[in-house]
Amino acid sequence: QLANHNLFNKSVKFGLKRIKLALKLLDHPEKKLKNVISVIGESGKFTTLFSLRSFLEASNQKVTTHVSPSLRDIRERFYMGKKYLTHKKIRATIKQIEKLNIPLTVFECLTLVYIINASKINAEYNIQETGALWRLDSNNVNDFPLIQICTNINKQHLNFLKRKTLDEVIQEDVGFM
């Protein structure tokens, strides 16, 4: 249902140009996120993210997380300090994004939903699960993440990334190394 919305660009061209323009028009909410932690890789990301979130919360730290995909409900993607965003808040944020009039991908829009709302929480840590194409992933908009955690990388995304070797997949997934 969300993917059929007229806001979204139907052809996916990976890159950061659209989301960076949106963030600029929104007055850079990503710059308000403290202690950004990126969890990068192909498998084990959710377990790593969830474990880290649990450890930080056990130390009485306020944490936000952004995961993809959601398993049962879109709200699972947006954890904001001990609670998930409501459907009403997600819809209201998408309406705010619509006003920018930028043809975004669904993932870019959902990343913006996270960033906009996380920027208002003032959490001590903001943990983002990053996708298969890290270098051009819409979560890759923070200039200086506190930590970048790399989980398992394998041949799972060879065809999706149009790569022939595991070394090429590693360059895309972990472009900072």
Predicted regions mapped to residue ranges:
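ATP-dependent carboxylate-amine ligase catalytic core
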Residues: 16, 20, 24, 29-33, ...
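Hydrophobic anchor at the beta1->P-loop junction of P-loop NTPases
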Residues: 37-39
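Hydrophobic positions on the alpha1 helix immediately C-terminal to the Walker A/P-loop
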Residues: 48-51
